[in-house]
Amino acid sequence: MPAQGDNSDTPRAISTERACVKKIFPLLLIPAVLTGCATEPTTVRIATHDSFAISDELIASFEEDSGLELEIIRMGDTGTLTNQLVLSKDEPIADAFFGIDNTFRGVAEENSIVDGEFAAIDYSDVCFNYDRHYFLDAGITPPTSWKELTDKTYRGLTVITNPKSSSPGLAFLASTVAALGDDYESYWQQLKANDVLVTSGWEDAYFTEFSGSSGEGDYPIVLSYASSPSAEVRDNGESQTAALLDDCFRQTEFAGVLAGAANPSGADELVQFMLSDQFQSAVPELMYVYPVTDVELPESWAQFATPATSTVDLPELNDRREEILGTWESIFE
């Protein structure tokens, strides 16, 4: 028998105790539910290079379908983008990335900055472009291959990009190694002696130094892409520029989810959106590169954005990266 006054085992006491638990338990759940709602991601961040372009309509479509706000973080050229993602991998600055290409993919893989697969989004052929008007006005025959750029005829006419920070720059360096073998170092020495200009990134080279885009630059030959002439079609229906389509380097750009992302599901949703017909159809006119899916291309591309007639590749690029960059630095720095 319980002591007098102790009614803890009586039906009334048990009923009261259960009632108290029922009242307290929902109250304990409320903060947990609210906390879960507060941490639900509402934004997805993508780190990319400065040349990434996406229309307001595409942004609105993604945000409406996903319920997420898209934040774009631009980080310079491809090399700078890759290096910054490596440096910040312990505290990722974004959820997804776009713009690491096959020349810098090895760096990303070695440093394990990507969670899952690299999704190919677009491709382009790194080729030299020249200003047709300049050569017509000057009465000079334009080059037919990058191998001719060491000729004195083209002294001081060419602008390229730094292979340490620029993916087109590294692609061209790889092209010379693949095509010339051990003679690539001699080629670069001759190119420097021919007063080639080196810029840090493609945008500076193309939009500032090249005479064929804005018409304000001093250099009529630029390292760019086979598709770039499609962006320079004038009112007369002709492109002011043309591309040298032999011995180009095929560049593929990837997107993916960053390891340690705060919103990996949102990042994956963004990558899938970039593979949709809606996004892929916009790629040519937004970024002047080729989509990876079989979507219809703009009519002008058949005439002004012809893919390279021949390409070169350097499968051992990742293994020889430091070696060939060191050789390049010894010549230019």
Describe each PLM feature range:
Residues M1-V44:
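Short, low-complexity disordered leader/linker segments with a strong preference
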Residues P92-F97, N111-Y130, W146-E148, G156-P163:
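A structural signal for short loop-to-beta-strand junctions that line the ligand-binding cleft
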Residues D115-I121, K147, A226, V233-F249, ...:
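Short beta-strand->loop
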Residues T153-K164, F273-L297:
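Periplasmic-binding protein-like
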Residues S175-D246:
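Ligand-binding pocket segment of bilobal, Venus flytrap-like solute-binding proteins
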Residues C37-V107, S214:
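Early extracytoplasmic/lumenal segment of secretory-pathway proteins
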Residues N102-S112, A120-T141, G169-A179, T252-G256:
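Periplasmic solute-binding protein
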Residues N129-Y134, Q251-G266, A282-L286:
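A bilobed periplasmic-binding-protein/Venus flytrap-type ligand-binding module shared by bacterial periplasmic
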